[in-house]
UniProtKB/Swiss-Prot annotation:
The gene is ssb2. NCBIfam families: ssb. One of its GO terms (cellular component) is nucleoid. One of its GO terms (biological process) is DNA replication. This is Single-stranded DNA-binding protein 2. SUPFAM superfamilies: Nucleic acid-binding proteins. Homotetramer. Residues 4-109 form the SSB domain. GO terms for molecular function: single-stranded DNA binding.
Amino acid sequence: MPEINSVIIAGNLTKDPVFRQTNSGGTPVVNFSIACNRRFRDSNHQWQEDVCYVGVVAWNKLAESCRDNLRKSSAVLVDGELQSRTWKAQDGTSRTVVEIKARRIQFLNKRKKNGEDDEEGFIEDDTHETHHLDDDGHMYEYKYLSSD
């Protein structure tokens, strides 16, 4: 059976993105969380709302673009893959997080350029690299091959 790891989600940033560069190599990386709202009717036919909070990580030029264009409450559409990472917390406990590693991010809010409305922004990570951070912020990476 083929393995598929693909996520597309739209939502709003819960706070400003956190931008940094890795300790080894200075590779740009940004983390942010989005809230994705879902409306549905319950068994009594009353409208209910549920919110799902999802963490997102982006690398390289995609990270820099997020730093420059996104703020708390910005609307985005994220296309990426799920990744999990585990680390030891300062208290010695093991922690695991599942987040989306972004391949493409579409900025859904219109941006102003020279006082005029601009088109929605769309940025893609075309490096074909997979990046991971260990608990000390050191990056290790591997590239995947594409048939392109």
